[in-house]
Amino acid sequence: PVKSAKPENQKAIRVEWLDGVFVEFDKLATLGDKSRIHLKIVNTNADDCEVDLYSGNLTVINEKGEESPIVSVKLGSKFNDRRVTALIVPDLPTEMVIEVSKLQSVALLQLKDFKNNIVKLRGLK
């Protein structure tokens, strides 16, 4: 029998955002008074895809149902507190890190690009 690389209980949260472009939850890390949501953007298309994000269009709801303000966003090598853009190359996962004030878990993470494409990930720990 073929064994999965990940244990059964470590099922990755992966959601399609754009046509053929997925958002994968990696981990939630806390350092001091900040938490970082680590994600991967994966393009399964044959062509490159540009992702353009404004921090005001990102929503993070904590375990208490409160919206956590976005401190900064990193997408690939771009890092900013307002807007990031990156070219997502096929089959090469691009790291995305969203920094927010400290939280225990993410009840809801909503990403919306400038074309109003929305993706929601829930229950991130």
What are these regions (language model features)?
Residues 2-18, 46, 51-65, 85-125:
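Surface-exposed edge beta-strand/loop patches
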Residues 26-27, 82-88:
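Beta-strand-rich interaction surfaces with strong enrichment in secreted/lumenal proteins
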Residues 32-36, 106:
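A generic structural signal for beta-strand entry/edge sites
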Residues 23, 37, 94-96:
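Hydrophobic residues positioned within well-ordered beta-strands of beta-sheet architectures
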Residues 69-82:
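Short beta-strand and strand-turn-strand segments in soluble, beta-rich domains
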Residues 35-45:
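Short, well-ordered beta-strand segments enriched in hydrophobic/aromatic residues
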Residues 22-30:
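Short amphipathic beta-strand and strand-loop transition segments with alternating hydrophobic
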